[in-house]
Every structure is written in structure tokens, then in C-alpha cells.
């Protein structure tokens, strides 16, 4: 991009907002990725926290979360009105049957099918109605650049998996990270990918520069750049579900991303932010877009009892999540 036209960007955002309102996108969801493990057998994506952990984890089984802890988190999300963005885990952290069992239990807790983001797999036929959709961690839609940032996740294999998912009746999603060094012109690759593979949902994230990665000294993408990408995609794909992630140090992005076409927002530490000034800020950002918020970051009554309402084996984890939510973590 040789020159930046701020007027053009603002016009795109305005058009995207008008389109969103016309489509009835007046409710914004709070989304939470539920992690299964901190181990990834690939462990070489240039930006990823897990890439810094692979050589430190001597026993990968110890990096797996307890299943009851995962299920308790899902129950708390349900109580607070949060959507589960997807189940996420590094390669070879859980078997397909283990993931299926976890998803079945979450489905029974929330009453909703689960999205998966658990890597490239040829075993999609093992899943059933407990799964709503399959997410491909594309990260960068420019094929040549994607090879650099995710060398062990071939884009053609992700694409084949998503096409198979569609054939099996699952919805299809992809994740895209902005701020990796891509150009705005790469949005054309993204358009082509969404169109070619009939993608139902795109989840955008801004780069989080993790220590010990190549991006440690990189900045997060500019808010208007992020907004321009999102508004461009919204205008091109009116029916696409768009989720946008931002970090606690960039909460001011929320409002402009919603106006740019986001249906939901993600990437928040739920139990750390709940009831704090940061949780309130999220709700205020949504309020000033004229949308309503599905779920809460502040209503303590929604936390519910300190015992599980579905399985007593989850009690200790429910109690801990509620206790963590009631602490003021940002004094």
C-alpha cells in the first residue's frame, strides 16, 4: 500500500456498519476459546506461545488440562452467556476420541454444538452432532507468506480438511492473524480463500508479541488497519460471521471493530477481567456502538452457585472459577 487514504477507510467502516445494521447484526457475542493443552507437536509457528514451550515440556501429558477443569470452564461460560469460540489444542495433545468425548460433554452442558480448532486431521468422520464446525488455523491467507510463518501447517492440507468438513455437513471457519508482516493487499488472497472454500466464519486476531518468538519486538497492528481489513471483508461477504480478537491493552479497538462488521469479540482473560474496570470497559465499548451484548463481564449474580449444576465432579473447579472472578485482579 503506497499511500494511506484515511477518508476511504472511514467510508468503508461506515458502509460496513450500515450493512451490519441492515442485516440485523445488533447483538454482539462474547467468545472464549477453551484450551485443551499447552503442548503442540508441531511447535514452530513463528508467532505462537506454544513454539516457546515445546523444548521446555519434557512430558507432554503433563501439559494437558484436566478434563473436568475444561468442562467446568464450559459450564461457567454457559452461566455467563459467553459462547465457546472453539476447543483449541496443539497437535497430538488429545486423541480424536478424547476430543469427541469432551465435545459431547460440553454439548450437553451448553446445549450448543462445539467448534473445533485442533489441527489438521483426516478423522472428521469420527465426529457427529456434538460438533458444529471445523476451524482451520490459516493465520495468513497469502500462500507464500503462510509457508514462512507456519512452516509445518501446509495450507493445502488445511484447505482439504475444510472441504471435507463441508462435505460432511460441518460449518467451516478460519483464523487470521493481523500484524505478522502481511500487506493490506493480502486481503485479496483472503477473499479468494473464503469464496473458494465456502467459509462460514472468520476469526481475526491482532498479533500478540510473545517473548522468545521472532515477533517479541513487533507492534500490534494499527486499529484503523485492522478495521479496514474487517470492513473490507464484511462488505464483500454480508452473510459471513466475523469474530474479532483484541487484547486487554487494546480494548479501544472493540468499538471500531464492531462498526467494521464484527459479530463477536474474543481474546479476553474472562475470569481475570470479570467484574473489573476492564470488563466494564468491554461492555461500554459495545454499548457505544448501539449494539446489545450477549453475555456479561460484570453481572456477579450470573456466576451462580459454587457447585456444578451438571456434575458434582466439577464442583472444585466451579468454586475456583467463581473465586477468581470475584477477586480484584487489577488493583
Walk through the language-model features, giving the residues of each.
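Active-site-proximal loop/turn and secondary-structure-junction residues that shape catalytic pockets
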Residues: 34-36, 91-93, 118-122, 140-142, ...
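Active-site phosphate/pyrophosphate- and oxyanion-stabilizing loops and adjacent acidic/basic residues
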Residues: 17, 104, 231
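N-terminal pre-triad scaffold of radical SAM enzymes
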Residues: 12-55, 62-69, 75-79, 83-86
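N-terminal small/glycine-rich loop or linker at the start of catalytic domains
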Residues: 29-60, 145, 163, 167-174, ...
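Core AdoMet radical
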Residues: 51-73, 77-98, 102-127, 131-165, ...
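Auxiliary Fe-S-binding modules of radical SAM enzymes
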Residues: 1-4, 195-331
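Catalytic cores of alpha/beta
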Residues: 121-130, 180-195, 249-261
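Conserved C-terminal portion of the radical SAM core fold
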Residues: 84-87, 133, 156-215, 227-243
